[in-house]
From Swiss-Prot:
This is Type II restriction enzyme LlaDCHI. GO terms for biological process: DNA restriction-modification system. It catalyses: Endonucleolytic cleavage of DNA to give specific double-stranded fragments with terminal 5'-phosphates. Belongs to the DpnII type II restriction endonuclease family. Coiled coil: none annotated.
Length: 304
């Protein structure tokens, strides 16, 4: 199906065409691990970690650790990395043998040198001393490298959105260059007004559009948002509602402004109803297949 056929369909038929061409993934090879970030986070405490190698395999490891941290308290700053925590100040619930509960806070960024024993007790109870004594076999730098790679997997959801933004930006850049259009990534309403003298009504004062494209010949702006959902959930309903509302705000502009939504992912199969409602209000909803087939270029072309 080409752009003109798609855009001429009734909203239900456009939705069916959209759903039939959803991509199975947007995960590029770079999605899985950001090695630059892993390297950067590991190197932060390389010196401390190499010093802590001293504790590997020690018999009386509690006493050795207490002495080491008493003499070099700054080494404690590396502990959060060893227990896979991004937090540098930890709130801890302690439960004793009588089931009495108490709370404490240990700051691993600003070390309290009067509480070294408390730090070591926590490290012991967290299982780290046992690991160092009985399981660690080589460099703690290498170990933390692996920990950081695991922690980085938590950022994959963010990378999925970043991937879509990157695809959109590369696509828009090529089209704009070929058609003599101006464009801006992460464009704000204030930028659009100051640079192109186009009024953009928005639902949020700090709204940034993933891309804005401007035609000098038409004095027109296309506002583009993009996202990707590999799984279902309540967020998809909220997003569909948000962009439906945003598209209606955009239509109130006294200037020539058009809203475009580029979205994809198998998650939409679980949220068809709210997406159907969005299709009833937003004419230009495209997926990655449609981008690949030139729908965005055709959208700009039909009015230039």
């Amino acid at each position: 199906m080409d752009f003109n056929n798609y855009i001429g369909l009734e909203s239900d038929d456009r939705l069916n065409a959209f759903m039939a061409t959803l991509s199975v993934t947007n995960r590029t090879p770079e999605y899985y691990v950001n090695w630059e970030k892993v390297e950067r986070e590991t190197r932060k405490f390389e010196l401390e970690l190499n010093t802590l190698n001293y504790l590997i395999g020690k018999e009386d490891i509690y006493s050795e650790a207490l002495e080491l941290f008493t003499n070099q308290p700054e080494l404690l700053k590396a502990i959060p990395s060893l227990i896979a925590s991004r937090d540098t100040s930890l709130d801890i619930l302690n439960i004793d043998e009588n089931d009495d509960m108490s709370f404490e806070q240990l700051n691993f960024l600003v070390i309290d040198e009067n509480c070294i024993a408390d730090y070591v007790d926590f490290i012991n109870q967290a299982g780290l001393l046992d690991f160092l004594q009985n399981k660690a076999k080589r460099s703690l730098v290498d170990y933390v490298y692996g920990v950081e790679a695991g922690l980085d997997s938590n950022a994959r959801k963010t990378r999925s959105g970043t991937t879509m933004e990157g695809i959109l930006e590369r696509t828009v850049s090529k089209i704009a260059q070929g058609k003599g259009l101006d464009w801006k990534p992460q464009a704000t309403a204030s930028f659009i007004k100051s640079q192109w003298d186009i009024e953009v009504p928005v639902d949020k004062s700090k709204r940034r559009f993933d891309a804005a494209v401007y035609s000098r010949a038409l004095n027109k702006v296309w506002l583009i948002e993009t996202n990707y959902y590999g799984g279902g959930g309540s967020k998809l309903k909220a997003v569909a509602g948000e962009f439906t509302e945003l598209s209606q705000f955009v239509k109130t502009s006294k200037d020539n402004v058009e809203f475009v939504w580029v979205t994809d992912g198998q998650g939409w199969k679980f949220s068809r109803l709210p997406l159907a409602e969005a299709f009833g209000h937003i004419d230009n909803v495209f997926n990655l297949t449609m981008l690949k087939e030139g729908f965005l270029s055709d959208l700009f072309e039909k009015e230039i």
